[in-house]
Amino acid sequence: MRRLSNQMLSGRRINFSRRGTDMTRRVRKAVFPVGGMGTRFLPATKAMPKEMLPVVDKPLIQYAVEEAQAAGIEHFIFVTGRGKGALEDHFDHAPQLERLLLERRKTKEIEAVTSWMPKSGQVSYTRQQEPMGLGHAVWCARDLVGDEPFAVLLPDDLVRAKVPCLRQMVDTYVEVGGNVVAVMDVPREHTKRYGILDVEKDDGRLARAKGLVEKPDPEVAPSTLSIIGRYILHPKVFDYLELQQRGAGGEIQLTDAMAKTIGSVPFHGLRFEGQRFDCGDKVGFLHANVVFALDREDLASDFREALRSIQI
């Protein structure tokens, strides 16, 4: 695994203004912004990264990585911060544990801790040295991404789907190129929680955007089509992130940079097939645990009985 700090990367700059015009090059790389403090889940996140919170028996970050693997991603880029050692350890082998499981012939357990791991050389880390917004976190990965399209996955957004959400997006990207984001309709009173598309054309599955607005008030929101934490982005977005302009909340917003690419890069929102859980919210996290437990053949029957026995 490669560990690269922002200082190490700063001496090696890429001229992002000289990009090719091929809008449908294969998406090989994914960025995972995982530098957040997880304050909404204190005290659980005092000593554990929020991305390591488990849904049933698997941490959120593993769900995101497995989704990326199913979409053909080959290079996994984690933008971390202080106190993320457990996350990095999760993507490394644990020889003592694996040896113990092997000695005890715990075949299923060995598979559970090794089968999904990216191969050596497929994982890179860089640091976001201060919390300056999602756009800044993505910008920190610029030299690792280079001059090619890339995905961004926010582990807080867990998607339950027959065809993984990012796989659906990659298939759509092959059709339309440019930027593709996963979107869902939300109640108008909730628009101030999300980035919202200003829609030019909408066929019910795919919406072509003419603009984006970050967390608009309901009365001025151009639509109710909100972006969730799944993106496929053209590298031109780095040209605008490079300007380090502050937006909503005084942070460098990814939405603002994406909006500026519209006109030079196609921009579409895909209504993905599946159910999204906001695991950055306690109720959403608990909801996900219930649904994913009921999906498990080894747990569903007993867990359903446990739910029926609850006295409220």
Segments and roles (model prediction):
Residues 32, 78, 152, 181-182, ...:
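Structural beta-sheet core signal
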Residues 29, 74-76, 122, 149, ...:
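Residues at the starts of beta-strands that form the adenosine-phosphate
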Residues 24-102, 106, 128, 164-168:
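N-terminal glycine-rich phosphate-binding loop and ensuing alpha1 helix
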Residues 2-3, 12-13, 18-19:
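Basic polycationic patches enriched in arginine
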Residues 97-100, 107, 113-199, 233-235, ...:
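Conserved beta-loop-beta/alpha segment of the NTase-like Rossmann-fold superfamily
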Residues 151, 170-174, 203-305:
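Catalytic-core segments of class I nucleotidyltransferases/pyrophosphorylases
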Residues 52, 123-125, 179, 267-269, ...:
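Conserved beta-strand scaffold positions in the cores of enzyme catalytic domains, especially
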